[in-house]
């Protein structure tokens, strides 16, 4: 599998740590007039990213981050998700469909509907991690898989 693409973006100095993962939420009203907006807002909202490296020591002023922002290199993080066991094969290319379940107070709900993935995303099952940590309340046979867009 090809190495995931990397991007340079800006993140709050306090958050700029190699290995840190975050979900990019998109711009706020304060960002509209910022001269760094294009560099800060070059990620896709709702996606999970991991910081691979810090680029230099320069700190830029930011109205949202009291200690400013720094340039970092990021990549989209793989996601652990629960999937139908019958469709869980390492190396498979899939179109992601979350488990059809609306039991939002279930302890498995977040792993069945992981943040960072959207219905219809084209993904590769990098690895079948193992069995789901609990039985499904709806009776589905689930496996945990690592997915990469």
Curated annotation (Swiss-Prot):
InterPro entries, A to Z: UPF0179
Superkingdom of source: Archaea
Pfam families: UPF0179
UniProt family annotation: Belongs to the UPF0179 family.
HAMAP family, sorted: UPF0179 (MF_00498)
This protein's name: UPF0179 protein Mthe_0220
